[in-house]
C-alpha cells in the first residue's frame, strides 16, 4: 500500500516479496510463449488482471508485480519491454509501445542509509490515449505523457509531456505539436 501511494516502502517486506514471487513464476512461463500459444491469453490475464481482450503484450516482457499495470483497449506492447510497477502504470487506449521500452515507477532514496535498508519510493506513470512510444525509450517515475503524443526512439522522459506533442532525446525535449492534418 505504501508503494502505491508514493511513501517510503520496504521492498523486502514479506507481502512485497510474495508479490514478486508470484509475478516471477508467471513471467517464467510467459517469456517462453508466443502470442499464438493456446495458453498465452490465460497467463497474460493472470499476470495483468483486467487486461482487455483487445490488448497485446508480446513476450518476452518483464514487470515486478503485474497487478500495478492498467492497460486500455487496443494497446500493443512489443517485445522486450520492462514495466517496474511498484506504483501504477496506466496506458490509454490505442497506444503503441515499441520494443525494449522501459517504464520505471520505483525511485530509490538519495540517502544511502535508507537504500541499505531496502527502501524505495514509487511514483505512478501515466501514458495517454493514441500515443506511440518509440523503441528503447525510458520513462522515469512520476511522468505523465498526454494523449496523442509521439516519443522518439531512445528518449529518456524525465518530465511530463503535454498532449499532442512530439518529444525526443536524452533528456527528452518537446519539439512540436503534430500538425492538424496528422491528427
Describe each PLM feature range.
Residues 108:
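Histidine-centered active-site/metal-ligand motif
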Residues 171:
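Walker B catalytic motif
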Residues 8-9, 14-68:
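Extended, small-residue-rich solenoid/repeat segments and analogous flexible loops
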Residues 115-118:
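SAM-dependent methyltransferase catalytic-core segment centered on the flexible catalytic loop
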Residues 1-5:
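Charged, compositionally biased N-terminal leader segments and the immediate start
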Residues 175-182:
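Conserved small/polar residues in nucleotide/adenosyl-binding loops
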Residues 53, 58-59, 64-67, 72-73, ...:
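Left-handed beta-helix
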Residues 11, 112-113:
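Short, hydrophobic secondary-structure boundary micro-motifs
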Amino acid at each position: 500500500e505504501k508503494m502505491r501511494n508514493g511513501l517510503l516502502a520496504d521492498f523486502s517486506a514479506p507481502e512485497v516479496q510474495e508479490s514478486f514471487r508470484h509475478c516471477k513464476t508467471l513471467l517464467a512461463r510467459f517469456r517462453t510463449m508466443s502470442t499464438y500459444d493456446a495458453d498465452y491469453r490465460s497467463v497474460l490475464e493472470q499476470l495483468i488482471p483486467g487486461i482487455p481482450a483487445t490488448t497485446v503484450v508480446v513476450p518476452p516482457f518483464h514487470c515486478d508485480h503485474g497487478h500495478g499495470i492498467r492497460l486500455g483497449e487496443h494497446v500493443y506492447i512489443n517485445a522486450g519491454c520492462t514495466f517496474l510497477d511498484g506504483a501504477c502504470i496506466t496506458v490509454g487506449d490505442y497506444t503503441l509501445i515499441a520494443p525494449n521500452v522501459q517504464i520505471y515507477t520505483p525511485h530509490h532514496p538519495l540517502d544511502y542509509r535508507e537504500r541499505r535498508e531496502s527502501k524505495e519510493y514509487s511514483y505512478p506513470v501515466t501514458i495517454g490515449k493514441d500515443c506511440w512510444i518509440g523503441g528503447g525509450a525510458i520513462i522515469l517515475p512520476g511522468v505523465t505523457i498526454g494523449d496523442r503524443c509521439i516519443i522518439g526512439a531512445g528518449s529518456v522522459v524525465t518530465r511530463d509531456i503535454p498532449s499532442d506533442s512530439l518529444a525526443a532525446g536524452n533528456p527528452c525535449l518537446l519539439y512540436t505539436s503534430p500538425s492538424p492534418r496528422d491528427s
